[in-house]
A protein has these predicted regions:
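Active-site neighborhoods and metal-handling regions in enzymes and metal-associated proteins
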Residues: 1-220
Length: 220
């Protein structure tokens, strides 16, 4: 199943107030390159839509919240984003994350997070995407993507550890979430992310825009 929809006169699908809209976007600025995906609920969806969406979100949050030994390979991290789906007998065939360049390519190595072995160590100052997804052929697909920065965490007798810090500041649609499927920790990670999004962006917005953002970043 193709992962990227390219509209043509033969394949154009008009948007309707139902189902999901998956938008994978990005741009290059003088400050750097962005890569982001959001899946947005446009109207009524099925229980399957909501379950798949929540599984993808669980994987996304688990990877974003990960702390790991400095120098771990992306292959070692990949299963973190897939484990909730595997328990449901689901999987995705694309990579979980890729390096992001500045002024060059949005897909830029050598580091990657994927099932196939990639031995490049993950170290401080690397940028990488966090983009698990699930695609049901001829039905619908879901992906949620942020760009992350590897930053120092702690140093112990076992060595140096690093963690991820989100660079992407954009609300994640909470409408389709089956909240009971999220652990307390996953809810905390999502709420903390949304609080950061609001605190960073709200000073840049007018009153109407701030109110929209406040609603979109409310805790669940």
């Amino acid at each position: 199943m193709p992962l990227y929809y390219e509209p043509t006169p033969e394949s154009d699908i008009p948007l309707k107030p139902e189902g999901f809209l998956l938008l994978d976007s990005g741009a290059q600025y003088t400050d750097g390159t962005t890569d982001i995906t959001r899946t947005i609920q446009l109207g009524p969806v099925s229980d399957l839509h909501r379950r798949v969406y929540t599984l993808v979100l669980k994987g996304h949050l688990s990877l974003q919240n990960l702390c790991f030994p400095r120098g771990a390979a992306g292959t070692q991290l990949d299963a973190i984003a897939r484990s909730a789906m595997w328990r449901e007998g689901m999987n995705y065939m694309h990579g979980t994350g890729h390096g992001v360049g500045s002024y060059l390519s949005v897909h830029e190595g050598p580091h990657q997070i994927r099932q196939e072995y990639r031995g490049t160590p993950m170290v401080e100052h690397m940028t990488v995407t966090d983009e698990p997804g699930l695609y049901l052929a001829d039905r619908f697909g879901v992906r949620i993507e942020n760009t992350l920065l590897v930053v120092p965490y702690i140093t112990t007798e076992f060595g140096r550890f690093v963690r991820f810090e989100p660079l992407t500041l954009c609300p994640i649609d909470t409408t389709p979430i089956i909240v009971d499927m999220l652990s307390a920790e996953e809810r905390s990670v999502l709420n903390a992310y949304h609080q950061m999004v609001y605190e960073r962006l709200s000073p840049l917005l007018n009153e109407d825009e701030r109110e929209w953002l406040r609603i979109k970043t409310e805790a669940i």
